[in-house]
Amino acid sequence: MAKNLVIVESPAKSKTIEKFLGRNYTVRASMGHLRDLPKSIFGVDVENGFQPKYINIRGKGELIKELKTAAKKADKVYIATDPDREGEAIGWHLAYILGLDPESSCRIEFHEITPGAVKEALKHPRKIDLDMVDAQQTRRIIDRIVGYQLSPLLWRKIRKGLSAGRVQTVAVKIICDREKEIANFVPQEYWTITARLRENDKAPVFDADVIKFNGKKLEINNAEEAAKTEASLKEAAYVVEKADKKERKRNPLPPYTTSSLQQDAVKKLNFSTKKTMLLAQQLYEGVNVGKGGAVGLITYMRTDSVRLSDVATAELRSFIGSTYGAEYVPAGVNVYSSKKNAQDAHEAIRPTSVERTPEAVAQYLTKDQLKLYTLIWKRTVACQMKAAVYDVTTLLIGAAGYQLRAGGAVLKFDGFLKLSDKKELAGEKEKEVPYLPEQTPLKLHKLMPAEQHFTEPPPHFTEATLVKELEEKGIGRPSTYSPTIQTILDRGYIVKDGKKLVSTELGELIVNMLTTYFKDIINIPFTANLETELDEIAEHEANKETVLENFYEPFSHLLQKADKEIETVEAPVEVSDVKCEKCGRMMVYKQGRYGKFLACPGFPECRNTKPILKKIGVKCPDCGGDIIERKTKTRKVFYGCSNYPECKFTSWDKPTEQHCPKCGHILYEKTDRNGNKKLFCTNENCEDAVKTYKGKAAANAKSK
C-alpha cells in the first residue's frame, strides 16, 4: 500500500496526478463536497452564533467509507482541493471526516496540474486556512438565510417553486433595469456630413467629417439644417488649419481572468459561460498528450488576477524571441494591474507551458477544447509582446466657419498583432490621410450626401456583458458568474433571445416585489459590500459572527414586515391556443429548467404536458411536413420534421424554402461569427455543393 494519500476534488484530476507521483502515492477524489447543510431543514442555529448544522451528503456514504479506510492505511494524508475558498472549505470538511487536525501541515496547494507544480506543493504543506473557511461559511450561511427564508415568501405570495438568491436576484434586477431603459428610450435624430477632399487634381482623396461651427460642436438635428450646412460647404474654400503626425502605440491586453475569458469566449467562439467553464475545467484537470501522458494544459481557471509568475514570463519572453524575433520582445516584462479585491495570490489563466502550442496539442483535443486553448494561448503570448505601433495623422480643416476633421492610421509595426488571424485583423482597417502643412489649400472633390441617424438605446445584456457588469459592480466572484446566469435562466426569470438576455414577466414581478420591500438588501451596493466583507474575513480583517449579525438583524425585520404587507398576487399565466386532448382545457405555457413547454392548467387532476413545436415556416423536403426547431439535451439547436418518428429528417443547419440554382436541392442557412447569414447546397453530387450564396446570389436562388 502507498505510504501517502493525496485527496483532490475530481477523478479526472486524480488520474492525472497519480501518474506524476509514482508508487508511494495514492490519489483519490472527494467528488466535490462531502458535507453540507441539510436540504430538508434550515440548518443554521441563529440563536447560537449562527452555527451551521452540517451533515454528510446523501449518497456519499460509501465514498466517505473508502476515503477513511485509505487514510487509516496511509502514513501521511495531503488535502489537495482547489486553491480557492470553496476548495479550502471542502478541505476543512475532509479533515473533519478523516479525523485530521486542520492545524497540522495537511494542506497542499497548486495552481497548475504539472509534475513540477504538484511535486513542489508536496514540499511545502501548510495548515488549512481557517479564515478562508470562515469566509466560505459566511457566504454559505447568508445564502441559506436568503434562500430558505425569502423563497417561502415568494411561495406564499406568488406561487410554489420560486426561489430568491442574494446574487441571482440582483443579476435579474440588472437585466430588468436595462429592459426598462430600452423601453423608455426616445430616439433623437441627428445628421452627419462628410466632405471628400484632395490637395489637387492628381493627389489622393480623403474624407473629413464636419465637427464644429464657429468653434462650437456642430449639432444637425433635421434635414433642413443638413441642407443649409451642405449649401454653405459647397461654396466654401477649404484650408488646413492644423496638422499633426505622431506614433500611437496599442498595447496588448492582460492575460485572462475568469471574467475576461468568459466574455471573449462568448464574443469570439459563441460559447456560453457554462460551456466555457466546463471546457476550461477539462483543460486544467489534464489531457493525455501522447508520450508525455496526461498533463494540465492551463492554470486554475477560477481567478480574478492578471499576474503571471516570474517563471512563466521568462518562458514566454524566450519563446517570443526564438519564434517571432528579438524585435517582438519588450525591454522589460509587461506588468498588468489586477482589479480591486482581486485574489492576487493566484495567477491569471495561462498555458502551463507555452511550448505546447495549439498546433502541437491539436490532435489530442476536441474541436471546442482546441478553440478555447488557442484563445488562452494566444492571449497569454500576446500579453508579453511589444505594442503595435501606428503612424497617426490628424488634419483639422477650416471652411466658412466650419471645422472638419480627417484622421488616418497606418500600421507601422505589428507587435502583438502578429498573433492575430485575418478575421481579427479585418476589423483593423487602415485609413491613410496625407500629412499636409498648415495653410495648405484643399479642393472639394465631392460633398457626400448628408446621412440621417438616430441615437440608439442601450443594448440588451448578453452573457458576456452581464459577466462584465457583475465584475465591474463587485457582485459575486469568478466561481459564481456562470452558475448565477444558469440559475436565473433555469428559473425562468430571464430567457435567451439569440444572444440577448431578456427578463420575463415572472422575473420582473419578483424583482419589483423584492426591491420594494428589501431595497436595502436586494441592491448592487449592498451585494458588492458583502463581497468586500467576505474578502475581509478571509484576510482576518473582519469577524464572521459580526458580519452575519449585521446582515441577519435588519433582514429578519424586513422579512416580517413584507410578510404582513405584501398582498398575494397571481403569477402571470400565458394561455396557448392548444387544447388539452385529455380534458379539453386550453393549455398554458410553463417555464421549466430546459425552457418553455405546454401544460394542462387542470394539474394535478390532469398531468398532460407537451413540448412547444417551433415551426420555421419551411416544409420537410422528405415528406412535406412542417420543419420544427428542436433542442438536444445539451441545448444545441437542430431541425427535424413534425411527423417524427414516421419521418426521420433532421439537420444541424437550418433548411430554407430556397433551392440551388444548379441542382434544385434545398439550400441550408448558416450564420457566421459576425452574424452574417449564408446559404449553401449540401447535395454531394452538385458542383456547387460547397458554394455559399449571399446577397444577390441568394436572392437569385430558385424558390419553390
What name fits each language-model region?
Residues 113-195, 246:
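C-terminal or mid-to-C-terminal helical accessory/interaction module adjacent to the motor/catalytic core
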Residues 217-254:
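Metal- or metallocofactor-binding catalytic centers and their adjacent structured scaffolds
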Residues 185-208, 239-279, 598:
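C-terminal accessory/connector segments of nucleic-acid motor ATPases
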Residues 2, 82-83, 159-163, 245-254, ...:
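Conserved short loop/turn motifs at secondary-structure junctions
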Residues 139-149, 167, 197-199, 248-260, ...:
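Core structural elements
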Residues 240-243, 252-265, 292-301, 457-469:
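Short acidic, hydrophobic short linear motifs in intrinsically disordered regions
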Residues 1-140, 149, 211, 227, ...:
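Intrinsically disordered, low-complexity regulatory segments
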Residues 2-4, 16, 25, 151, ...:
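Basic, low-complexity terminal or inter-domain segments flanking catalytic cores
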